[in-house]
């Protein structure tokens, strides 16, 4: 029988790894301990940095010499890193499939194997002290050698590992060598939706423990009224006694000695931790060796107790909801090798968008991340490193989850997580992993988690919550979530994944939130996911872009399915995150114009609105004419206050009220007067009366076999009788358009419409519909010339289409009123992306000015974050740089839009009549629709010499159907009868207000 390799033995989780324990550092003095800087802790040596490195084709290719002899000629790499990201071996991305043959627990013999070497000069280890090396992440299997001596082995890629290296060290130079395998038996339960990559990807460092030292501690809080009853359990080695102190930054609130490893105390008028007020006490242990303090161990400790009563979870006795996201570790330059600054920036962005919870999908994080969540106020569904999704491809996702032979591997992963992180106030519940089916090993994990800690346990694929404490679903539709609310489950419920954020989207978050707000039994929701997993790259021509699956020749792959976050790979918020932040804003408002009263509701869970101020802005036709500051005061959670606010409506124009909510306080995540959100209310609309147009010369018409040319005082407009388009339009000697209006039902495909495309549009060729012009005619109508174009727009292969009529009314002023109507024929009446027109204007540097929703990108089911106003930008700045280019730049609720060159000339689009009651949407791109649609990366986008302008009468909502929820019925656009009108006006350098003035032309 063949010998069993350690990396192919699921029953063997480690060799010589130290037992898991709370994460902490020991210091030589109290002053050093007060810094909380691990770099100043006893014997700390940072081993992250430059290492010698060589990649071997497999573990058998690594000789003992390469683990015991320094190889100065090897390459240098900077740890932490993933070697594939640094150009060694092959990057691969799959959502769920294993990139190797399924033969658990075995992996290929040509298993890429990296060997790291580093010389570390160390002083002699003090008598009785122990030298510990700690790895916070090795993927997927690591062996450690010191001075040629085998120290130990670890698995569980995203879990920390410590080894005692004391006996292998010498005074002076020491050779540390680490052998890392890309694949191991652990890879079968580490099949998370992310890049397959490997290496020492988190920090590695040395720590020193004195002869008398703390081994572990456990801190538990029980709330009784305003008091916190605290239980402390400690494990120490060689210590004569252990003394603890708890202080609030100014005063010691509790102190005592842990007798036989146990102590109890109470804190009166305790300041309990919560995500809105994440107060942390300073907990310090003094470990004595005889009469001398051997080490000081500090920990920033929140007072928090999580309890479950019926189907509700409580934090310190208070009900709450989690408005969260699923977060993977990701850095666009380093993959999963995420540094502290990146973690901080993630949490800052979350808090700045009203997010109060994270699910650590689907593995344990760097231990400092939990410390930061305590500090910033982020509640955690703390998930361990486990997913076996790839087995679904062979018909049994629970193949190893329900195999007792794999129990040690499963239990090891939850034990290490809970033991290391259970002192953190931010952790609301533990999660056993993701998408691994259900079976005996989940039950074993649950038992271990509850043996070690009392907080509730979550696991989505325990679909009936037979074992776990929290029932969960993912990607449930709005109607299904409402049904869950109407028929409550006996246990608490969360929606652990929803709102799939692939590319442009998600849409429909407001409707979800209305349901979540309605039902107390639904206690949390988590967007999938936080950040795109794109990796920064540069083409041979020097063009920057972001890679996804398949870009490295990897096959099989899941293409851009990893580009599914609310934050771009470079940590810039997407329009989807901006929308989510507004949807979950805890300052809710309603306005009663008749009563002159603004109702402000506090949807926080723990704190009042005492820190909030409101700025109420009155807008007329999009511009602010009046501001007033309001103070809601100490409105308690869940309560409302009515504030007097009388808005004077304008005699002429559209009057709107926009109320911005700011926090006046400075936080670790924001500066004072940071905006939390805004609400807008329609007050009145009194369109300006049309004024009589000045007398202008009559229009003249020239007709040839192929053209109809209409002359006005300052310009001319030419129609092609061949294809029915505006072939030329000039005003004051300048081109108004480069290509005239064409009716369209398609726009570049967005990821969230992928399932509609696969099930409807692709087979019906909606994206390649053809236009046939049947008739072009004209007539004189008073002072106007009316040109009528009849067309049929239909796909190849199929026998359905749309009979379209475009009626252009050309007026002496140069204005063109366009009425577009359509009647369908055939058997297709399902959804389509849009109903509208597109045209091109010359130049690619156009300024854009509009009155409508803004300033950011918005869509029919995603516009809460963008109130109506008067905005200015450029075409380039409107374009959203999605990693895979797709439809973007839309602005809803548009009353008018002007696109102008640097000379001030251009075109104005509005409705012929009251635009406020009948707005349209528009987008403008420096590319053609075809260019965007065919592009796979931003480097495929090549600018032409025109700007594409899209005017939409109807636009399909975004939804989140890349993997989730289709577009809600109220945001659907169907292939049905339609009719709409727009006015097109040439602009010169004259004032825009003059062009906007309503003019009645006979």
Regions found by a protein language model. Give the residues of each.
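Accessory beta-strand-rich segments of carbohydrate-active enzymes
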Residues: 2-8, 12-17, 37-38, 52-56, ...
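Extended substrate-binding grooves/exosites of carbohydrate-active enzymes
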Residues: 1-39, 79, 94, 188, ...
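An acidic-aromatic loop/edge-strand motif
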Residues: 82-85, 90, 97-106, 155-157, ...
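Beta-strand/loop-rich accessory regions of lumenal/periplasmic or secreted enzymes
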Residues: 84-87, 94, 137, 182, ...
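Extended acidic/polar, glycine-enriched regions
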Residues: 167-173, 233-309, 651-703
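Surface beta-strand/loop "capping" patches
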Residues: 211-238, 574-612, 692-706, 820
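Intrinsically disordered, low-complexity Pro/Gly/Ser/Thr-rich segments with frequent PxxP/GP/PP motifs
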Residues: 260-269, 622-652
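Glycine/proline-rich low-complexity spacer/linker segments in large multi-domain proteins
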Residues: 2-26, 36-38, 151-152, 175-208, ...
